[in-house]
């Protein structure tokens, strides 16, 4: 038991459940922010590449 952290109190069953719910909420928020940002960056990069590489017609 020498490696056990004595300063950290043990969590009760209720506290563990609350912590698990909080972590799930944080994960949902991360996905609701990160996924749209990644999609937006991807679309912008694809648009830039398309505009730079499209064939030009001279009239």
Curated annotation (Swiss-Prot):
Residues 1-11 have a biased composition (Basic residues). Its main location: membrane. It is found in: Membrane. Keywords: Coiled coil, Membrane, Transmembrane, Transmembrane helix. One of its GO terms (cellular component) is membrane. The keyword Chaperone does not apply. It comes from the Eukaryota. InterPro entries: DUF4519 (IPR027960). The keyword Transmembrane applies. PANTHER family: SINGLE-PASS MEMBRANE AND COILED-COIL DOMAIN-CONTAINING PROTEIN 4. This is Single-pass membrane and coiled-coil domain-containing protein 4 homolog. It comes from Argas monolakensis.
């Amino acid at each position: 038991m020498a490696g056990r952290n004595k300063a950290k109190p043990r969590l009760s069953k209720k506290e563990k459940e609350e912590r698990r719910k909080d972590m799930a909420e944080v994960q949902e928020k991360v996905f609701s922010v990160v996924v749209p940002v990644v999609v937006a960056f991807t679309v912008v990069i694809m648009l830039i590449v398309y505009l730079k590489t499209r064939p030009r017609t001279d009239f």
